[in-house]
């Protein structure tokens, strides 16, 4: 993320992004990351790779929210108020070498408030314009969270690594 900071800042300003959810930040505890007019909440991995962050415009009232009980999933969460009601917003990442555990996903959902999750679970499914479905992708489609899930993964244009910000997998409950 550090090497693409100017590109990210340009994208956020050009598209008037108030809350930006990031995965695979590749930041570690000793590295500072700041953008003008933004507050950065992040979860770094102790080893190389991974990591998540949420950039929030300073004018947006919000709180950092802990997510206890995560085993393999890396996630950063905030709480904002929209239309007078609280909503939890998460950025999450799961390494391809880590197993997808239902308890990790369940820990992200708060039964008391709506949740929006944008994540990179290294999962593929044909419903998401992928040419194949993986076991993780199949699990995500039928994810047993015990709560209604609206999946917004369908992206009209082909997915490419050249446009990583067009690869979200947001879930809301």
At which residue positions do the language-model features occur?
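A shared catalytic/ligand-binding motif for oxyanion handling
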Residues: 1-173
């Amino acid at each position: 993320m550090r090497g693409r900071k100017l590109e990210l800042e340009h994208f956020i300003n050009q598209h008037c992004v108030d809350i930006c959810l990031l995965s695979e930040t590749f930041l570690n505890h000793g590295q500072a990351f700041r953008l003008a007019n933004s507050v950065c909440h992040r979860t770094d991995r102790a080893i190389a790779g991974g990591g998540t962050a949420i950039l929030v415009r300073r004018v947006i009232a919000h709180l950092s929210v802990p997510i206890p009980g995560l085993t393999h999933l890396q996630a950063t969460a905030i709480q904002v108020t929209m239309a007078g009601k609280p909503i939890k917003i998460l950025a999450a990442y799961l390494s391809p070498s880590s197993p997808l555990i239902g308890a990790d996903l369940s820990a992200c959902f708060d039964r008391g408030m709506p949740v929006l999750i944008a994540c990179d679970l290294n999962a593929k499914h044909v419903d998401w314009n992928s040419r194949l479905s993986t076991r993780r992708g199949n699990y995500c489609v039928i994810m047993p969270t015990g709560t209604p899930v609206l999946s917004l993964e369908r992206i009209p244009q082909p997915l490419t690594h050249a446009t990583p910000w067009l690869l979200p997998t947001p879930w809301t409950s």
